[in-house]
Amino acid sequence: MIRLAACQYAIELHETWEAYADHLQGLCAEAVEAGARLLLLPEYAGLVLSGQLSAEQRGDLKASIVGIQPLIEPWKALCESLARRWGIYLQPGSIPVLDRDGRYRNRAWLFGPKGVLGYQDKLMMTRFEREQWDIAAGQGLQVFDTELGRLGILICYDNEFPMLARRLAEGGADLILAPSCTDTEAGYHRVRIGAQARALENQIAVLQSPTVGLAPWSPALDENIGRAGLFVPPDHGMPGDGVVALSEESSPATSQWLVCEVDLEEVRRVRREGQVFTRRDWPEQFERIV
């Protein structure tokens, strides 16, 4: 049994590095004290670093991501130090990163007790990212080997595309981390429904962490709504609706952790002994439509 913590992350203004570092450390300490071994924050949680920029720069959609680039390495070092100190796995949400080709990508690093395990870029861009923000798509999917099991990361919109999760499942992932950032109930439910569908199709677990709250100082994070949740395939020994845990409200005033547990061996058992074999039978559908 693994104890996980997914954050409903309230977007707050932290105008100095010290204030931000204290905030992140204190927030993570709450989950660690609750016994969590893996902590998940949402998509674009790293963009909160833009609070340290001038009001003019943080209020400009493109200037804000330019301005945070010098803060990314200190931010990574902070996240790594927290993971090492507490012996945990930390996925601190995603952050826009200037890549080697001069394009910005939405990147999610994973940190563990021994340091940086790697990163996953978002692959499918929303209309906002494509049309207004010029965030570029990443390439390729990573499966991370950890002491807890094999993990994959699908950032927000990526959860709405079945073949991405399928590739992670084929690579051995038992748990997908789904950091998300949505500004409407419809947006939140698109990601959640996608996450639950991916859990059903691949007979794996999916953990979702959303942004919440209002941040009028940030044009990218101004409105946020969503619930944290842990989803599994509905089957023998699993919840009938596939929902292991779900936040009570979608717009809390402050950041809240959803601390929950999953037995990945029980999830694997469903793949062997379940009422249905959606994972095994996946290829058969393509034989039926030719």
Go through the PLM ranges and name each one.
Residues L71, W75-Q91, E160-T254:
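CN hydrolase (nitrilase-like) catalytic-core segments centered on the catalytic cysteine
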Residues Q8-E15:
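Short polar catalytic/cofactor-binding loops
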Residues P92-G93, N106-L110, Q142, Q208, ...:
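Short beta-strand scaffold segments in enzyme catalytic cores
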Residues W17-P113, D183-A197, N202:
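Cys-nucleophile CN-hydrolase/nitrilase-fold catalytic domain and related Cys-dependent amidase chemistry
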Residues W257-V290:
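A short C-terminal boundary segment appended to hydrolase-like catalytic domains
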Residues M1-A6:
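Extreme N-terminal starter segment of soluble prokaryotic enzymes
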Residues V97-G171, T184-A197, V276, W282:
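Active-site catalytic loop in hydrolytic enzyme cores
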Residues K122-I135, T254-R269:
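A short, polar/charged loop-to-alpha-helix boundary motif
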